Amino acid sequence: MFKAVMNAKNFKKIIDSISNLVDEICFEVDELGIKANAMDPSHVALISVNIPKESFDEYVSDTHDIGVDLEALKKIMNRAKPNEKLMLELDMEKNKLDIILKNEGTRKFSISLYDVSSSNVKVPEIGYPNEVMIKAGTIVESLKDAELVNDHVSLKITEDGKFIIYSKGDINTNETVLDRDNESIIELKISESSKSTYNLAYLKDITKATSSEDILHIHLGTDMPVKIEYIIGDTKLIYLLAPRIES
């Protein structure tokens, strides 16, 4: 038994946030909600999503593993209208997930379930020296600037309280410098200076589905995986991206 009802717009944003990095995923559902952990195919990035039952208007579930093709699910959610209600139901007899959209009428899609085993991927417990709380729109625009120069970007923290997004090409550079007085910075927690370099395309994928006013929690340390967290309603998303170790 699995049945869940929520606003279609919110679920679409969750699926967009996941499908930018992985093609298929195993949702672990139980009486507490839906969760999933997955690595991207290159094992460079990890994503963790937790959708508690409080996120739903209605929620009833036993324990199941539901493996889905995210590309197929994303295409369906792209057809959803903002004011529609979404109902998810597990059809165990047909081994399908029913996706029902309701507003003035009812539209029903059914997708076959994948034999995707429950993931053993865990989010590692890492102690970070620095944390930046920042509006997502500022990060998205800064990454667009950095992309003009290189396909990698460095995230720096200075001891005097600055967060720097920096890229360097063969002849050109780009730098965005933000401090505590910047209106997009909610909070800076700094214990030490740090610098790490990351694949820019992955950072763009991680932030692609965010809204400009979403608050990102970015955890940083020198040559450490960057940890990025944000909330969609009651849903928590966590990303880890491995650094590019420079010689």
From Swiss-Prot:
Listed PROSITE patterns: PCNA_1
InterPro entries: DNA_clamp_sf, Pr_cel_nuc_antig, Pr_cel_nuc_antig_C, Pr_cel_nuc_antig_CS, Pr_cel_nuc_antig_N
Keywords carried by this UniProt record: DNA replication, DNA-binding
Secretion signal, residue range per the UniProt entry: none
Superkingdom, natural source: Archaea
GO molecular function: DNA binding; DNA polymerase processivity factor activity
A Pfam family of this chain: PCNA_C
GO terms for biological process, alphabetical: leading strand elongation; regulation of DNA replication
Function: Sliding clamp subunit that acts as a moving platform for DNA processing. Responsible for tethering the catalytic subunit of DNA polymerase and other proteins to DNA during high-speed replication.
Subunit structure of this chain's protein: Homotrimer. The subunits circularize to form a toroid; DNA passes through its center. Replication factor C (RFC) is required to load the toroid on the DNA.
Family: Belongs to the PCNA family.
Protein name per UniProt: DNA polymerase sliding clamp
Lineage of the species this protein comes from: Archaea, Methanobacteriati, Methanobacteriota, Methanomada group, Methanococci
